[in-house]
Regions:
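Short, well-ordered amphipathic alpha-helical segments that serve as non-catalytic structural scaffolds
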Residues: 27-42, 66-70, 95, 159-166, ...
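Condensing-enzyme catalytic core mediating Claisen C-C bond formation in acyl metabolism
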Residues: 1-25, 36, 220-283, 287, ...
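Flexible glycine-/small-residue-enriched beta->alpha junction loops
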Residues: 110-165
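Active-site-proximal alpha-helical scaffold in enzymes
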Residues: 87-117, 167-196, 248-255, 342-361, ...
Length: 385
């Protein structure tokens, strides 16, 4: 059976909104990790078959197939193509899936997968709101569709509403959310201070570490914040941060490993994606994880480490309740609440962190999943070699 191997994985530090990466052109962020990836892997970049990048809100500096632009901005060979993927927040995890599938199919041997996002320059959902308004398009991507309205009516399609629905369904109160968020910051600060991210991170200028983790946050400060929605439980403290960053991985076939003298660090054991209620939107990692475990015959206890995106605290807390996973194996170095969530780059960032942490701890299996717009979730299981 064919295999898809992960050979290398790197990322920028994650920048805070308006922080050290805020003024950097997104193509230059992507070029930075591509340059580092090629150098670390020691490959001839002309041997790469394709570059698959995730990116949302593809307008302005993120428009025009930014995967291709990043590669060219890095000064890499013009004959190598690039394609940009949008599966909402799971875009660069899907990029890894597409890269692995190309390798597994035997049609390609060396594929770069990754993602980039500069949310300081292009705000979230800009493409569906502000960019469309000058054209007189004010209904967003859903309400103007007669088929959508016939099926879902005029229910709000909103991530905050979805997070509140999860909190209500699984009985997750504000205090539980804030305790989880506090733990995310503490884990992230510990990871930075002990150098756990050093191998995976490529500094950009003076930005050498993730800017998001708050050393001084306290339960009292979190409790003082107002909910985003009236009468709700979700606050900024329990939500992922607006961020900038990029990440990239190199996937290779057995033939490429042999021909280029590469060292496989992990193999892709499983990849899948599932969907459910697009209004609740953010709970799809639960059925998607169950599906992946059933397909592989693995139990949740067999998974050594999990990276699940902390879009909102209830997303992870509901997933923990349903899967019975050990919280000490989940987001051990913090998550998006502390580290940030540069949308189209986050999937590749999570996979990069998962690979390096498996190597640090000696674990065998790592599972990555994340909630996505439209009520979807990717799941990837890798096996450290």
């Amino acid at each position: 059976m064919a295999e898809a191997y992960i050979v290398e994985a790197v990322r920028t530090p994650v920048g805070r909104r308006g922080g050290g990466l805020g003024a950097v052109h997104p193509a230059d962020l992507g070029a930075h990790v591509l340059t580092a990836l090629v150098a670390r892997a020691g490959i001839d970049p002309a041997a790469v078959d394709d570059v698959v990048f995730g990116c949302l809100d593809a307008v302005g500096p993120q428009a025009g197939d930014i995967a291709r632009t990043c590669w060219l901005a890095a000064g890499l060979p013009e004959e190598v193509p690039g394609v940009t993927v949008d599966r909402q927040c799971g875009s660069s995890q899907q990029a890894v899936h597409f890269a692995a599938q190309a390798v597994l199919s035997g049609t390609q041997d060396l594929v770069v997968a990754g993602g980039v996002q500069n949310m300081s320059q292009i705000p979230i959902a800009f493409a569906s709101r502000q960019a469309a308004e000058p054209l007189g398009l004010t209904d967003g991507p859903f309400l103007g569709s007669t088929g959508w309205r016939a099926r879902y009516g005029d229910q709000p399609v909103n991530q905050f509403t979805g997070a509140e629905m999860i909190a209500a369904k699984w009985g997750i109160g504000r205090e539980e959310q804030e305790q989880f968020a506090l733990g995310s910051h503490r884990r992230a600060v510990r990871a930075i201070d002990t150098g756990r991210f050093a191998r995976e991170t490529v500094p950009y200028g003076e930005v050498a570490v993730d800017e998001g983790p708050r050393r001084d946050t306290t339960p009292a400060r979190m409790a003082a914040l107002k909910p985003v929605l009236d009468g709700g439980t979700i606050t900024a403290a329990c939500s992922s941060q607006v961020s900038d960053g990029a990440a990239a991985l190199l996937l290779a076939s057995e033939r490429a490993v042999r021909d280029h003298g590469l060292r496989p660090r992990a193999r892709v054991h499983h990849l899948s994606v599932r969907g459910e209620d697009p209004i609740r939107m953010l709970s799809a990692p639960i059925p998607a994880t169950a599906h992946a475990l059933k397909r592989t015959g693995l139990t949740i206890d067999a998974i050594d480490l999990v990276e699940i995106n902390e879009a909102f605290a209830p997303v992870v807390l509901a997933w923990l309740k349903e899967t019975g996973a050990d919280p000490e194996k989940v987001n051990v170095n913090g998550g998006a609440i502390a580290l940030g969530h540069p949308l189209g780059a986050t999937g590749a960032r999570l996979m990069t962190t998962l690979l390096h942490e498996l190597e640090r701890t000696g674990g065998r299996y790592g599972l990555q999943t994340m909630c996505e717009g439209g009520g979807q979730a990717n799941v990837t299981i890798i096996e450290r070699l």
